[in-house]
UniProtKB/Swiss-Prot annotation:
Source organism (scientific name): Mytilus edulis (Blue mussel)
GO terms under biological process: mannan catabolic process
Entry protein name: Mannan endo-1,4-beta-mannosidase
UniProtKB keywords: Disulfide bond, Glycosidase, Hydrolase, Signal
GO molecular function: mannan endo-1,4-beta-mannosidase activity
Catalytic residues in the record: 177, 308
Binding-site residues for substrate, renumbered to this chain: 79, 176, 205, 240, 279, 337
Post-translational modification: The disulfide bond between Cys-192 and Cys-259 has not been observed in X-ray crystallography. This may be a consequence of the X-ray radiation.
Length: 367
């Protein structure tokens, strides 16, 4: 009996600390935390992982990790497949046949480097903000469930399963700005699929390609697949604007649990936390911007991270003031955009502004 009790005690205390959700807060190892960091985005666009490609950008990746750690940050968002330029492996008919034999080892090498710097990594799988030469690969996954299932079976689940015990894996971002390819202005008797509220909003800038239902299914199926192999995984979507991320203010939340399940039918295929991007237009934020509201104004029941922003498109706000706003107005994280764009020093000043803060969530913590 004593040995059994000790074994149970060891198992319960030896569990790996992970990011988790508590109401509208993010927790790590039982403590309320705030995700403070930046978008690496990429070093070599769409060619950073797999086919031994990580070695080419390794020094830049690790320099970013070092900078963020030294300025008090704790997390990085980085892009993976984008539109399928180099990963995963596709056949001539658009089905995913697998991943090359270095994709997981490349990702793991990056995660190990991040762990040495106490930084959580969030991999963004796909990108909806552009439509480029290999978009036909992503398009197949969006419109054909057989092709989407081939990606899930032969790439996504093997990746998620192989990396689930990596301490630096913060979570999975299914798609960057799906609204870039949404069909705005569509009427539907199902509110989840009605996009009339996006008419004239700028949504669909890369092409009016997919219905809200197709986007929701794409997210729902992948979120469910990740959780099937890793029930504790954190999943999000990098939404372009609060107009698609809240039911408040006359908008509609395309990524609510109800709408994602309605679109794809998989009960577990929901988000762990919301993520929104915000930039000014003609030096002004839209009235729906998170930099004009406290988190509570959006009436969401899950945490929200401001996943892209920067001083250069911040309506006159400094990087420091933007991080301060996100931290003190109820949000759960702030990732400035990006290492590949605009002033890195400006971004680092914003990250440093929150260094060692604990009053609205712990910013520095060990992995």
């Amino acid at each position: 009996m004593l040995l059994t009790a000790l074994a149970v005690l060891f198992a319960s205390t030896g569990c790996q600390a992970r990011l988790s959700v508590s109401g509208t807060n993010l927790n790590y190892n039982g403590h309320h935390i705030f995700l403070s960091g930046a978008n690496q985005a990429w070093v070599n666009y769409a060619r950073d992982f797999g086919h031994n490609q990580y070695s080419k950008g390794k020094s830049t990746f690790e320099s970013t990790l070092s900078d963020i750690q030294s300025h008090g940050g704790n997390s990085v968002r980085v892009w993976l497949h984008i539109e399928g330029e180099s990963t995963p492996e596709f056949d001539n008919n658009g089905y995913v046949t697998g991943i090359d034999n270095t994709l997981i080892s490349d990702m793991r090498a990056y995660l190990h480097a991040a762990q040495r710097h106490n930084i959580l990594i969030f991999f963004t799988l796909w990108n909806g903000a552009v439509k480029q030469s290999t978009h036909y690969r992503l398009n197949g996954l969006m419109v054909d469930t057989r092709k989407l299932q081939s990606y899930i079976d032969h790439a996504l689940k093997p990746m998620a399963n192989a990396l689930k015990n990596e301490k630096a894996l913060g979570g999975w971002d299914i798609m960057n700005e799906p609204e870039g390819e949404i069909k705005p202005g569509e009427s539907s008797s199902e509110p989840c699929f009605d996009t009339r509220h996006l008419s004239g909003s700028g949504a669909g800038w890369a092409g009016h390609l997919y219905s809200a239902q197709e986007i929701g299914r794409f997210v729902n199926w992948q979120a469910a697949a990740i959780k099937e192999v890793d029930p504790g995984a954190m999943v999000t979507v990098g939404s372009w604007n609060m107009k698609a991320d809240t039911d408040a203010m006359g908008f509609h939340n395309l990524y609510s649990d109800h709408c994602l399940v309605k679109a794809g039918g998989k009960q577990s295929g929901t988000l762990s936390f919301y993520q929104v991007h915000t930039y000014d237009w003609q030096n002004h934020f839209g009235n729906e911007s998170p930099f004009k509201h406290s988190f509570s104004n959006f009436r969401l029941k899950k945490p929200m991270v401001i996943g892209e922003f920067n001083q250069e498109h911040g309506a006159g706000m400094s990087s420091e003031s933007m991080f301060e706003w996100a931290y003190t107005k109820g949000y759960s994280g702030a990732w400035t955009w990006s290492r590949t764009d605009v002033s890195w020093n400006n971004q680092l000043r914003g990250i440093q502004h929150l260094k060692s803060r604990t009053d609205h969530g712990q910013v520095q913590f060990g992995l």
